[in-house]
């Protein structure tokens, strides 16, 4: 009986151990950085080769947007990002109106493998130039 229990325990530990190790790992999950509008503006002034991504709807973009911003509505990121943003290591600065949709867009970009995503909230707090 004791030999049988040892065998059962050994088999259980052999099967359970890999699951225990995998379950505790975060898998090296990536994330995006949340920065202020002033920090985003400083990056725009000092960096080159970045993308400004407006995550709002077309009518909102038409009413006014940050100069040079491209429009990809937050709910279209999964469908359009790979075509519009081919370099997954490029600096991508994401905004929307208030910050809610830009967070969703930034999360989706990270899920798609983008590695240099910065979310800076909404245009309602943007204190710099806007074009129509």
Task: For each feature predicted by the language model, list its residue ranges.
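Structural scaffold elements adjacent to functional motifs in cytosolic proteins
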Residues: 52-54
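Hydrophobic helical h-region of N-terminal Sec-dependent signal peptides
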Residues: 13-14
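Rhodanese-like catalytic fold shared by cysteine-dependent sulfurtransferases
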Residues: 2-10, 19-38, 43, 50, ...
